[in-house]
Design a protein with these regions (language model features):
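N-terminal helix-loop segment corresponding to the beta1-alpha1 unit
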Residues: 1-99
């Protein structure tokens, strides 16, 4: 939908509810950028069948993240925190979502 194309969401998400919500918003045309820890990754990577034959790229993870962009960022590191704050400013984030 063109109605939502100018809305940017930065999402720090895991589990089921928020990833599903941001999936729906991405399908409605919003730009969704999800943050993922560079070492631990998203636990959803391990759910479902391994349909591609690639490590940590299982079916549920692929489906629930369709239409989203992704960045890896270590928020425990001061440099990661600095990048996080600059992302919010420079991307003109309309919504920050976390669970």
């Amino acid at each position: 939908m063109d109605l939502f194309k100018d809305i940017t969401i930065l999402s720090l998400e895991q589990a089921t509810v928020l990833p599903y919500l941001t999936y729906r918003l991405a399908q409605d045309g919003m730009q969704v950028i999800r943050l993922e820890h560079p070492i631990y990754g998203d636990p959803n990577r391990m759910i479902g069948e391994n349909v591609l034959g690639e490590e940590r790229m299982n079916a549920y993870f692929l489906c629930i993240n369709a239409g989203k962009k992704a960045l890896t960022l270590n928020l425990a590191d001061p440099e990661g925190q600095k990048i996080f704050h600059s992302l919010i400013k420079e991307l003109n984030v309309d919504i920050f979502a976390t669970n």
